[in-house]
């Protein structure tokens, strides 16, 4: 398909939810954290059960999925002890001594070991994602490591699309470093780049932050790469309007990248499940009512949350997919849909899109 892809960021145990979804599916592709494909360890409530049920559920629905190697979290001091037992069981967590660092990945043997470990959970995927470290600037030695990880991944990917992850902090989003990093990843052979910004609140993004994110998207797109905004919640459609190929989030969780490099709770935590209001980029609480209906035929929660958790999750995916496609089709003119939102934050996004349109004129 053309631009406007919506990627489901899978929760750890939602295989039944995925299998039971009716067609047409409310997402275009999916991303599974490598942690959610690890063997269940002894003592775990699911010990002995299949480790790959998320992948199997997606395969049963004919969905293209890829893996987030989720290796940046392994950089934090003490990460070996902070991991949950299942996460500690994954091959990338055992490939070389932790914590990961540019120094520990200086030798080619370590590069090979980490990439080959990451490949074990990607055998059924039609894309191949390279392991990665968080990067600060173009001079960061971790960027050189990421380029080497990408080169080795290219050798194992075969004819599969090669995915790079660009994880930065908000500081380096705003200082302009990330655009150059995206260009370097593209030059090393990445075909898709998932952008992850830590210490950033996407659903409360300021105009300055949206402009900075748009600049990263433009840099990668200009270099010939499909840019995907990862874990951005309802900001995703705005970023698609600026030129992103798509965005990834979940109906409830994975609405931002955890501020902690290695969060104790796993990084997918969320607050209250809200009902996404069409064309308003805001959410309603379970007890709220709305005069705006879901625009997708067959939605199980067309008139608001109604206290139905499952139906609200499905509706939210419908709305994210619809918004992604509209934003891709309308481009910067997508601002008109957001300009009358009750949210001042969202109206600020509309003004930012209008500003970009004036620049492009």
Locate the predicted segments by residue:
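Glycine/Thr-rich beta-alpha phosphate-binding loop at enzyme active sites
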Residues: 178-215, 242, 256-272
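Glycine-rich adenosine-cofactor-binding loop
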Residues: 213, 223-237
């Amino acid at each position: 398909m053309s631009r406007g892809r919506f990627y489901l960021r899978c929760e750890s145990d939602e295989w039944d939810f995925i299998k039971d979804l009716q067609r047409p599916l409310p997402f275009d592709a999916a991303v599974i954290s490598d942690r959610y494909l690890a063997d269940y360890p002894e003592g775990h409530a699911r010990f002995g059960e299949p480790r790959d049920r998320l992948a199997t559920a997606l395969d049963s629905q004919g969905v293209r999925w890829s893996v987030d190697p989720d290796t940046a979290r392994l950089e934090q001091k003490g990460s070996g002890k902070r991991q949950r037992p299942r996460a500690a069981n994954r091959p990338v967590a055992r490939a070389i001594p932790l914590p990961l660092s540019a120094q520990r990945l200086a030798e080619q043997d370590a590069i090979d070991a980490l990439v080959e470990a990451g490949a074990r959970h990607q055998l059924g995927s039609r894309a191949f994602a390279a392991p990665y470290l968080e990067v600060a600037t173009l001079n960061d030695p971790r960027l050189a490591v990421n380029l080497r990880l990408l080169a080795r991944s290219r050798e194992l990917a075969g004819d599969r699309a090669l995915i790079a992850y660009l994880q930065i902090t908000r500081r380096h989003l705003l200082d302009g470093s990330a655009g150059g990093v995206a260009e370097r990843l593209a030059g090393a052979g990445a075909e898709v780049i998932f952008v992850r910004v830590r210490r950033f609140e996407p659903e409360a993004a300021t105009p300055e932050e949206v402009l900075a994110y748009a600049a990263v998207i433009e840099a990668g797109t200009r270099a010939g790469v499909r840019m995907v905004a990862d874990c951005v919640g309802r900001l995703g459609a705005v970023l698609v309007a600026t030129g992103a190929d798509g965005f990834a989030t979940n109906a409830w969780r994975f609405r931002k990248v955890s501020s902690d490099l290695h969060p104790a709770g796993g990084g997918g935590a969320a607050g209250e499940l809200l009902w996404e209001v069409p064309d308003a980029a805001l959410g309603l609480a379970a007890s709220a009512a709305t005069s705006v209906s879901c625009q997708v035929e067959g939605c199980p929660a067309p008139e608001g949350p109604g206290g139905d958790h499952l139906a609200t999750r499905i509706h939210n995916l419908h709305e994210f997919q619809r918004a992604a496609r509209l934003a891709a089709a309308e481009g910067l003119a997508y601002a008109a849909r957001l300009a009358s939102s009750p949210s001042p934050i969202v109206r600020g996004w509309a003004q930012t899109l209008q500003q970009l349109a004036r620049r492009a004129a």
